[in-house]
Structures are given as C-alpha cells and as structure tokens.
C-alpha cells in the first residue's frame, strides 16, 4: 500500500513507513476521522494487515490511558505501545481535544513500554 500524504496529521516521525492520525477526543473516547490520517512511505500487504488488526487495540488502550489520566489532554506526554510487530506512539501535545498518533513498523523505542 503506497499512500504518501502531503499533510502529516499524526506525530511527525522520520521513519518510513509510518501511519499518522489526529484522533478527536470526546471525554475518554477517541474518534478516528479518515480525512485526518495518512501514510508516509509504503506498507507491504502483510504490514497493512498487521496495522488493520492492531489499530483498534491501540485506540482502545489509549482510551484507557485517558480514563486513568496517564494520557492527559492538558499536558504533552508521549506514550509508546507495541502490538503485532508495530510500534505506536501517541501524545495529546496539550491540545485539549486531540490525540496525535504515529504507528511504525519497528521495535526499539525505550519510552513507556506497554505491550497490548
């Protein structure tokens, strides 16, 4: 799958392939808007299937992190999640209503490890 976007909606990362999105926060719920998401680089068919499977789990876990206040809309704080060989990073960037994400096909971030 090759979808290079001119607009980067998620967290900006220098690694490709990368899927980025700006999720809309409503209380402790997150909403995905397809027009606020995009790809940088190309994911293989296998990687695309991994992303399709992992994405709902990433979002559900981020919602739990909002509920526990580990992810706070008022303060920038990057969290890292791992699933299906993918690394997901998320941060509100203190935006009061958005959660920015980047999902990469790699391991090795040493921040807040959460295998979900």
Swiss-Prot record:
Additional observations: Encoded by the CP4-6 prophage. An insertion element (ISX') seems to have deleted the end of yagB, fusing it to 13 insX' codons to make a 116 fusion pseudogene that may be expressed. The cognate toxin appears to have been deleted at the same time.
Record-annotated membrane-spanning stretches: none
Keyword Transmembrane among record annotations: no
Keyword Ribonucleoprotein applies: no
Name of the featured protein: Orphan antitoxin YagB
Family: Belongs to the CbeA/YafW/YfjZ antitoxin family.
Keywords per UniProt: Toxin-antitoxin system
InterPro entries the record matches: Antitoxin_CbeA, CbeA_sf
Superkingdom of this protein's organism: Bacteria
Short name of one Pfam family: CbeA_antitoxin
Single GO biological process annotation from the record: positive regulation of cytoskeleton organization
Function summary: Putative antitoxin component of a type IV toxin-antitoxin (TA) system; its cognate toxin is unknown.
């Amino acid at each position: 799958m090759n979808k290079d976007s001119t607009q980067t909606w998620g967290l900006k990362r220098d690694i490709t392939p990368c899927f980025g999105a700006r999720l809309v926060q409503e209380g402790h719920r997150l909403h995905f808007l397809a027009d606020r998401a995009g790809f940088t680089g190309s994911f293989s068919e296998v990687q695309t299937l991994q992303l399709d499977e992992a994405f709902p789990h990433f979002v559900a876990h981020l919602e739990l992190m909002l509920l526990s206040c580990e992810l706070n809309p008022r303060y920038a704080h990057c969290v890292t999640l791992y699933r299906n060989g993918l690394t997901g990073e998320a941060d509100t960037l203190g935006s009061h209503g958005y959660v920015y994400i980047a999902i990469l096909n790699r391991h090795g971030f040493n921040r807040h490890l959460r295998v979900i």
